[in-house]
């Protein structure tokens, strides 16, 4: 038969199909297709057989070192063997319509080298392939659906690396000696887990290792029964390695662990451990900063902690006992007590059986309370004798109903100089929110001090903290701390109080947020109160010390003075100084000094005072004088020998008496009538009576009737009411020089009697008034023009004089 017409035998047909299926794998393995075919099904071609034999002989005697290769899995059933890297990525389906996983449960991959790797991409779901001798398995979940790699059918694996873009990722069937790595998980809701076999966790000394790199997901669970939302079990010693990028683990779940080792070269946070029997937490191998929350383990167990060389924080929900050992290691380390809402009061401080400190190399003690939902807050008492290495104390109050009390006893000078207090964002409460009692170990000196920084913007519960109250007291015997410095931080206001008999030498306050308030719940009896570096709006009351100096800052401040010799500097902005009869000084011996500073400042006098240059000469740099004497008072403006810049007088309560303002300068051009003016007589006169004096009268009376107003030196009077409710009635107005009366605003102005002595009045203009106006100009001897508001419903009642007058409106 002609060779060209020869039909292929059955064996040849089988070989052709087999070759097509395995061609790629065969080429990757370095075996010729011809040799593979012949080895599979033989040949009746002597020439080929001879050639193949020769080729095989040459290959067998070669001394070339095998080179690791790369193998790609397909969309079919794969059985691959070789040394190198196996790629099990997403591939097209047989029909070419969908992307599917190339690694399936029926696939077998055998690594023949010593460092074989398989890279697996999973689109969700569980797979259980057979992986033999592949040392490193990289398993990545590419979608939102959780994916699990089951290694029950596999062996020879030393490392499993888990990663995910979204969905939970895990591995099951993990045997003894397998390190689990978790990396590149940036979704905060993603979990990772390593479910170990029952054989792997036999005994009481099972160890497991988890390495993280850039994990910022939720849980990492390790051990038998571990799943995305289930803690593992059966592991007694768990080692956590952290490197590369920052990692933050919400919960490290291995419930049976008694020893935790942390080796972190990068910043690492573990917010919770599911294990409740931890006796050893060893982070001495860490060089990066660690934050580890062991919750109740310190209180429940004899607990030993060793920190690393970074800035470490150990978090517990209780204090420590004499059988514990807390060593922060190198770096600036913190022991943070964050109690549960159901906890009782906390006592911090204990010594070992040998009366030695059980805490060392910890620089900051941090204490935080939560709202316990009851009538009493959780209080802290700490004996700093038992924490000699601590150089700073931090507190945070969180109860919404009752003040959290912090008793800081036996502090040394360094500790007393580095105290901080914050709030948990609980908003305004009816009582004091935090009370801090400061106690020094040695307060025998004459210049003992304490410094506390208060932050009013911490908001763990997402509610902005504002106007929280902090009461700072000296609990040292005989109140021996002479000076207190309070630094205000944050963006919210604060209410600051101190015990009346404490910090007698000085109180210094700095900081604060602009446009926020700094108020006080107590009088300040410190010899010096320095708030010159405060940006907030200050309101406080001075004490009755014989001598006191007060400085305020750049906010709009209101200071209430008291008896004694006071030196006051209100700094920048528009400030108000309120002082009574005793406050402004009534004797030559008084050495007060009231300096309004920059801005438009107000001196508010609430009592009667001696009208003399000796008394009023203590005032400088005020622009407004508010008279509220509750009785008859005369003030000669020229007696303000150091304050010629007054521009406004506010007349308030004179108890039905008379307020007389004499010798007003030309710059004093505004007279405000407050509602206390009812039943009073007000007299305003100039130091120099020029031909063009102008006075603005601003009414804020809320319906008041004044008995009389005398303004004899004013040619032009511009009257205005602040609001429709500011209705003013003046029984008698006397104004000898008055030529023009302009009336505006929504409130009524009713001048009951004819304006006395007003022979020169020629213009009454009420066109800008929307309230009722009543003016009787009977005494004018010149032709007048009177204008009402024609567009308003307000009543304009006018009486002209003896000349030819024009009335419109």
Language model feature labels by segment:
Residues 1-33:
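Bacterial Sec-dependent N-terminal signal peptides
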């Amino acid at each position: 038969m002609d060779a060209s017409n020869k039909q292929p035998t059955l064996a040849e047909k089988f070989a052709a199909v087999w070759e097509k299926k395995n061609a790629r794998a065969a080429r990757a393995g370095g075996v010729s297709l011809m040799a593979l075919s012949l080895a599979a099904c033989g040949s009746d071609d002597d020439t080929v057989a001879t050639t193949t034999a020769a080729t095989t002989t040459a290959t067998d005697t070669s001394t070339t070192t095998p080179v690791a290769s790369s193998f790609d899995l397909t969309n079919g059933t794969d059985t691959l063997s070789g040394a190198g890297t196996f790629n099990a990525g997403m591939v097209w389906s047989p029909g070419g319509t969908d992307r599917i996983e190339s690694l399936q449960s029926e696939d077998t991959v055998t690594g023949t080298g010593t460092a074989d790797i398989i890279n697996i991409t999973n689109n969700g779901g569980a797979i259980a392939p057979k992986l033999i001798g592949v040392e490193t398995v990289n398993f990545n979940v590419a979608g939102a659906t959780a994916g699990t790699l089951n290694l029950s059918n596999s062996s020879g694996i030393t490392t499993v690396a888990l990663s995910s873009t979204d969905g939970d990722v895990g591995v099951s069937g993990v045997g003894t000696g397998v390190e689990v790595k978790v990396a590149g998980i940036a979704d905060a809701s993603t979990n990772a887990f390593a479910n170990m076999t029952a054989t792997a966790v036999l005994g009481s000394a099972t160890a497991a290792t988890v390495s993280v790199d850039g994990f910022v997901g939720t849980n990492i669970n390790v051990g038998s029964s571990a799943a995305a939302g289930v803690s593992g079990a059966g592991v007694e010693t768990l080692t956590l390695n952290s490197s590369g990028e920052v990692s933050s683990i919400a919960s490290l779940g291995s419930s049976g662990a008694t020893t935790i080792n942390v080796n972190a070269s990068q910043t690492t946070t573990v917010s919770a451990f599911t294990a409740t029997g931890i006796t050893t937490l060893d982070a001495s191998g860490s060089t990066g900063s660690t934050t580890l929350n062991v919750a109740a383990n310190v209180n429940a167990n004899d607990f030993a902690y060793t920190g690393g060389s970074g800035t470490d924080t150990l978090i517990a929900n209780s204090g420590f006992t004499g059988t514990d050992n807390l060593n922060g290691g190198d770096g600036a380390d913190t022991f943070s007590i964050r109690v549960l809402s159901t906890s009782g009061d906390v006592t911090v401080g204990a010594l070992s059986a040998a009366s030695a400190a059980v805490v060392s190399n910890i620089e900051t003690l941090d204490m935080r309370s939560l709202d316990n939902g009851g009538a009493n807050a959780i209080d802290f008492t700490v004996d700093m004798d038992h924490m000699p290495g601590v150089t700073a104390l931090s507190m945070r109050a969180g109860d919404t109903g009752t003040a959290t009390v912090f008793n800081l006893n036996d502090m040394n000078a360094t500790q007393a100089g580095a105290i901080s207090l914050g709030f948990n964002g609980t908003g305004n409460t009816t009582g004091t929110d935090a009370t801090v009692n400061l106690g020094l170990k040695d307060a025998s000196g004459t210049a003992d001090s304490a410094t506390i920084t208060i932050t009013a913007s911490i908001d763990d519960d997402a509610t902005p903290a504002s106007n929280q109250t902090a009461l700072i007291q000296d609990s040292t015997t005989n109140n021996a701390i002479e000076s207190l410095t309070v630094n205000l931080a944050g963006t919210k206001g604060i209410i600051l109080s101190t015990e009346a008999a404490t910090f007698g030498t000085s109180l210094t306050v700095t900081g604060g947020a602009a446009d926020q308030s700094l108020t006080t719940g107590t009088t300040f009896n410190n010899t010096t109160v320095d708030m010159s570096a405060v940006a907030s709006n200050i309101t406080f009351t001075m004490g009755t010390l014989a001598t006191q100096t007060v400085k305020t800052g750049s906010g709009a401040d209101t200071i209430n003075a008291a008896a004694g010799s006071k030196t006051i500097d209100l700094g920048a902005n528009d400030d108000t100084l309120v002082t009574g009869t005793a406050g402004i000084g009534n004797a030559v011996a008084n050495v007060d000094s009231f300096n309004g500073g920059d801005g438009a400042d107000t001196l508010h006098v609430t009592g009667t005072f001696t009208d003399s240059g000796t008394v009023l000469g203590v005032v400088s740099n005020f622009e407004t004088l508010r008279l509220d004497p509750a009785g008859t008072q005369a003030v000669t403006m020229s007696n303000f020998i150091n304050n010629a810049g007054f521009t406004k007088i506010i007349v308030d309560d004179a108890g039905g008496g008379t307020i007389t303002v004499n010798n007003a300068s030309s710059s004093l051009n505004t007279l405000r009538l407050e509602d206390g003016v009812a039943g009073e007589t007000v007299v305003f006169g100039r130091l120099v009576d020029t031909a063009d004096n102008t006075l603005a009268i601003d009414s804020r009376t809320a319906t008041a009737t004044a008995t009389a107003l005398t303004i004899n030196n004013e040619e032009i009077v511009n009257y205005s009411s602040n609001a429709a409710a500011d209705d003013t009635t003046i029984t008698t107005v006397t104004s000898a020089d008055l030529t023009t009366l302009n009336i505006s605003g929504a409130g009524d102005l009713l001048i009951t009697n004819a304006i006395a002595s007003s022979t020169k009045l020629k213009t009454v203009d009420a066109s800008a008034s929307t309230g009722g106006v009543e003016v009787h100009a009977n005494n004018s001897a010149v032709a007048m023009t009177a204008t009402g508001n024609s567009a308003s419903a307000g009543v304009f009642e006018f009486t002209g004089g003896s000349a030819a007058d024009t009335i419109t409106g």
